[in-house]
Amino acid sequence: MIPDDLRLAQVDMSEYGLPQKRKRIILLGLSKDYFGENAVELLNRFYNELLPTYKRRRMSVGEAIGDLPRLLPLRDSVDKKISHALAETRNCPSDHEPRFHNARDTAVFQMLAEDIRSGRNEFSSIESLKRLYTSLTGRQSNIHKYHVLKSDEPSNLIPAHLFKDGLRHIHPDPEQARSITIREAARLQGFPDDFQFCGSQGDKYKMIGNAVPPYFSKLVAEALHELLKDC
């Protein structure tokens, strides 16, 4: 048995301390053969009483990734494979290197991030971002291709599509002028820094985007334990 009204099962994980706006349906199924008529009551208790007790204050992008070493654009890229380098040599967690960005994208990222930081907000509307994309590429798009993360807000959704490009996950610091690294995506998805990802860079981004955030999974497990311990 699952809830009759699936709206009951929809959660925004940013309300549970994940630094990301991630809405998902979390289904809890209970066997009527085992729980009998209590199944309905238990489901309502899980969604209405227990799970909401694990809500936390919203965490921002800045809180989640702001302490990571800065990665600044190089004046000249290296073999069209490396476009950024660490600004300092302090300890750096694994997978904290950005994908390669060409000079055009680096300039666009810097401009858009500075537009937000300065408060000008010339590119705050969807239409202005569409026009920018067309002016740069000569192509039309029904959706805006660029999005800068805001330091004082949770991130937008971290999707599996991130393996294709990072245009919708631009770092908020204009001086870094880049999209987010694997480690930054992992932090926004609730992975600890000692979690190791295997495969190519694209595989790692896809793995992170497809994951159920482990931090949120732990909260669901704790709420479920509370529900079942007295059954």
Task: Name every feature range the model reports, one short phrase each.
Residues 1-136:
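Class I S-adenosyl-L-methionine
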Residues 77, 81-231:
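C-terminal target-recognition/interaction regions appended to catalytic cores
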